[in-house]
Amino acid sequence: MVTVKLYGMAYSTCTKRVYTTAKEIGVDVKIVPVDLMKGEHKEPAYLDNYHPFGVIPVLEDEDGTKIYESRAISRYLVAKYGKGSSLLPSPSDPKAYGLFEQAASVEYSSFDPPASSLAYERVFAGMRGLKTNEELAKKYVDTLNAKMDGYERILSKQKYLAGNDFTLADLFHLPYGAMVAQLEPTVLDSKPHVKAWWAASLRVIPGRLLRNSSKEFM
């Protein structure tokens, strides 16, 4: 089995995004912890050798190839090791590939900003000893609810965001989506097609896999 190194942290949603992708295509992951609280991600050696902007995660492949940014890492893993997987349509099929990139762009531009901001206010701020700004948190919830109107329109016509197959575009939602589902359940269960999509996505990638990603860092 292929084994890759993943530099990251247990509670990093972006680290979980890569871990989940790797496990879905049968790639083993060796976790290399990067302690954000100690500032290890800002040390010169890390900046020079792993991530020029000093964030996580970073993948190191068996041949020494290093890739950073969680969505880029996930695409790389599936392109190299997930042959035949529906997670990433082949560029040789322009329509399927274009619809996938469209859906992936929706996650990146419409879902991630308010979802990650809500998670920061309600969870990560407290981990840093900061108080939650409830006014901001409510703003992010309102934004997510408005975005779900667009999701409902898409998902009323197809099972998943890029069509009728589960792809990375759906998987990319899972780490922050799991947090949103706990923090504000109505965001993902108040609209019938969004609710069905979320349930179907969790059947493909069980919640236990997202939880287990943290255990490998211990």
Curated annotation (Swiss-Prot):
Amino-acid positions noted as binding glutathione in the UniProt annotation, renumbered to this chain: S12, T13, H41, K42, V55, I56, E69, S70
Q: Indicate the segments forming the GST C-terminal domain, all copies.
A: 93-218
Q: Please tell me which top-level EC class this enzyme sits in.
A: transferase
Show the catalytic activity: RX + glutathione = an S-substituted glutathione + a halide anion + H(+)
Q: Which Pfam families match?
A: GST_C, GST_N
Q: Where in the cell is it found?
A: Cytoplasm, Cytosol
Give EC number(s), comma-separated. 2.5.1.18
Which SUPFAM superfamilies does the entry link to?
A: GST C-terminal domain-like, Thioredoxin-like
PROSITE patterns, A to Z: GST_CTER, GST_NTER
Q: Which UniProt keywords apply?
A: Cytoplasm, Detoxification, Oxidoreductase, Peroxidase, Stress response, Transferase
Q: What is its main location?
A: cytoplasm
Where is it found, in Gene Ontology cellular component terms? cytosol
Gene Ontology MF terms in the entry: glutathione transferase activity; peroxidase activity
| Transcription is among the record's keywords | no
Gene Ontology BP annotations:
toxin catabolic process
UniProt tissue specificity: Expressed in vegetative rosettes.
Matching InterPro entries: Glutathione-S-Trfase_C-like, Glutathione-S-Trfase_C_sf, Glutathione_S-Trfase, Glutathione_S-Trfase_N, GST_C, GST_Phi_C, Thioredoxin-like_sf
Question: Where's the GST N-terminal domain?
Answer: 2-85
Q: What does this protein do?
A: Specifically catalyzes the conjugation of synthetic 1-chloro-2,4-ditrobenzene to GSH. Also functions as a glutathione peroxidase, converting linoleate oxidation products into their corresponding hydroxyacids. This enzyme may thus serve to protect the cell from oxygen toxicity as well as from exogenous toxins such as herbicides.
Q: Which family does it belong to?
A: Belongs to the GST superfamily. Phi family.
From the Swiss-Prot or TrEMBL record, give the protein name: Glutathione S-transferase PM239X14
Please report the organism this UniProt entry assigns to the protein.
Arabidopsis thaliana (Mouse-ear cress)
Instruction: Give the source lineage, highest ranks first.
Output: Eukaryota, Viridiplantae, Streptophyta, Embryophyta, Tracheophyta
